Swiss-Prot record:
Enzyme Commission no: 5.4.2.12
Catalytic reaction equation(s): (2R)-2-phosphoglycerate = (2R)-3-phosphoglycerate
Name of encoding gene: gpmI
Binding site for Mn(2+) 1: 410, 414, 470
Entry keywords, A to Z: Glycolysis, Isomerase, Manganese, Metal-binding
SUPFAM superfamilies listed in its UniProt record: 2,3-Bisphosphoglycerate-independent phosphoglycerate mutase, substrate-binding domain (SSF64158), Alkaline phosphatase-like (SSF53649)
Cofactor: Mn(2+)
This protein's name: 2,3-bisphosphoglycerate-independent phosphoglycerate mutase
Entry's Gene Ontology BP terms: glucose catabolic process; glycolytic process
Species this chain originates from: Methanosarcina mazei (strain ATCC BAA-159 / DSM 3647 / Goe1 / Go1 / JCM 11833 / OCM 88) (Methanosarcina frisia)
Note on how the cofactor is bound: Binds 2 manganese ions per subunit.
Catalytic site positions: 70 (phosphoserine intermediate)
Binding site for substrate: 131, 161-162, 193, 199, 270-273, 343
Similarity-based family: Belongs to the BPG-independent phosphoglycerate mutase family.
């Protein structure tokens, strides 16, 4: 039988369990998932209905061939439709010319002209396409040049996670050569995303980034950006972890610091890792650290980072209606969202269509992630604590629907440490076993899946170097319940919400264009 709801007695919960970074790849080399001992997931894949889901490219609203990511994945899952992403929207606007007539970007340029000030372009300089894209930076530079700006400064945040760990050297060489041909554009600072894009309130990192931008104070100084990266490699730092470095002029002074009346365009379009630095610049009641200097700037966000801030947004979000959380709430169902810090925003904000609001009947549980520099040092992260809590909640009889994310395979996969990734996979498998048993006891069921791959490819198959980025591989989806489910059809992430509603015997709204994966007996 289907999952049925009895409002006057203990509920039999239906769970969506998202194993972040659990991709499917048949090759064993560099595959931490196949190298791990996973008796619980192996048994479920053998005995229960399963299928494959697409998590990348056009299947999730990204350009063809573009790997998926957690933000995109959870948006598609919660919306029950393909959500066209900011990367796609911005790319299209550049191609058709709308980008160069964007009123928000033009206002930032007008502010510079009015005050004879500087334009600062800051963000992740990467072709990864997860948080930003290099083509957007070059489009911004082109726009500034077309409008005759003479003082344009680039503050380079380096990737090393969504692209190989030392991909930045080539990208920075390309950018530096461009700047030398265009004297109105200069690179002013260089630093890894570990500092400029922290999202876990490790304010000491954000402060280092902020001080470099506003004070011209940083652990290192150098005469050019390429040297900054090369010297960091010599210190043993890879792109993500390159300490803030000031690029100096011929007299040894910073090329630029951010001053009053300047304009800033933060070119990242993904919000979660753009918020903390943005707060440091714009919040009156900011408490993360003491700001020695707070320049009064014209601050532009490429996309919406925080709906509570009244800031100009170059590409504002489209409003997603009738998302999974709202449909469940409108039906009077009680739902739980649970994850540790690293993925909490994904099972709440992103799953709710990029909205901060919490629906009626929606409980949220945040388990703190361990305070360590990189998660290869503790591959278990907080998975066991998440599991302890969710098992209690399952057995409480309170919840109709539970949505859970395990961060381990993705976050440890990003470190490039194969053995640590194997431990992460085994940790998650152990937790899956406990949760499935608790669901069985409670008469519940689960769909177990992932938002994108990662841990299944820990090694670059061409170079043998660590592979730290997401993959474009499909992911598995397993149904653990009993009843009349004969099989699952292959699909994409946007089919998960319609499938959950089908199991709950709730008609999907018209806005959900995904389909149920269920094949019934």
């Amino acid at each position: 039988m289907r999952i049925s709801l009895h409002m006057t007695q203990a509920r039999r919960p239906l769970m969506l369990m998202i194993l972040d970074g659990w991709g499917y790849r048949e090759e064993k080399e560099g595959n931490a998932i196949l190298a791990a001992s996973t008796p619980h997931l192996d048994r479920l894949q053998k005995e229960r209905p399963s299928c494959f889901l697409e998590t990348s490219g056009e299947a999730v609203g990204l350009p063809q061939g573009q790997m998926g990511n957690s933000e995109v994945g959870h948006l598609n899952i919660g919306a029950g439709r393909v959500v066209y992403q900011d990367l796609t929207k911005i790319n299209v606007s550049i191609r058709n010319g709308d980008f160069f007539e964007n009123p928000v970007l033009l206002d930032a340029i007008s502010n510079v002209k009015l005050n004879n000030s500087s334009l600062h372009l800051m963000g992740l300089v990467s072709y990864g396409g997860v948080h930003s894209h290099m083509t957007h930076l070059y489009a911004l530079i082109k726009l500034a040049q077309e409008k005759g700006l003479k003082k344009v400064y680039i503050h380079v945040f380096l990737d090393g996670r969504d692209v190989p760990p030392k991909a930045a050297l080539g990208d920075v060489k390309e950018l530096d050569a461009f700047c030398k041909e265009n004297q109105s554009v200069k690179i002013a600072t260089v630093q890894g995303r570990y500092y400029a894009m922290d999202r876990d309130k490790r304010w000491e990192r954000t402060k280092l980034a902020y001080d470099a931008l506003t004070l011209g104070v940083a652990p290192y100084k150098t005469s050019d950006a390429v040297t900054a990266v090369s010297e960091a490699y010599e210190r043993g730092e890879t792109d993500e972890f390159i300490k803030p470095t000031i690029v100096t002029d011929s007299e040894g002074n910073p090329e630029a610091v951010i001053q009053d009346t300047d304009s800033i365009v933060f070119l990242n379009f993904r919000p979660d890792r753009a918020r903390q630095l943005t707060w440091a610049f714009v919040k009156d009641d900011f408490e993360g650290f003491t700001r020695e200097k707070r320049p009064k700037v014209h601050y532009v966000c490429m996309a919406q980072y925080d709906e509570t801030l009244d800031l100009p947004i170059a590409f504002p979000p489209e409003e997603l209606t009738d998302v999974l959380g709202k449909v469940l709430s409108d039906r009077g169902l009680i739902q739980l969202r649970i994850a540790e810090t690293e993925k909490y925003a994904h099972v709440t904000f992103f799953l709710n269509g990029g909205q901060e609001k919490c629906y009626s009947g929606e409980d949220r549980c945040l388990i703190p992630s361990p305070k360590i520099s990189t998660y290869d040092l503790k591959p278990e992260m907080s998975a066991y604590e998440v599991t302890d809590e969710v098992v209690k909640r399952i057995l409480s009889g309170k919840y109709d629907v539970i949505i859970l994310n395990f961060a381990n395979m993705d976050m440890v996969g990003h470190t490039g440490d194969f053995e640590a990734a194997v431990k992460a996979v085994e940790t998650v498998d152990n937790c899956v076993g406990r949760i499935v048993e608790a669901l069985r006891t409670a008469g519940g069921a689960a769909l177990i899946t992932a938002d994108h791959g990662n841990a299944e490819q820990m090694e670059n198959s061409h170079t043998g170097e660590p592979h730290t980025a997401h993959t474009s591989n499909p992911v598995k989806c397993i149904y653990t319940g009993n009843g009349e489910v004969k099989a699952l059809e292959n699909g994409k992430l946007s089919d998960l919400a319609p499938t959950l509603l089908d199991l709950l015997e709730i008609p999907k709204p018209e806005k959900m264009t995904g389909r149920s994966l269920i094949v019934r007996k």
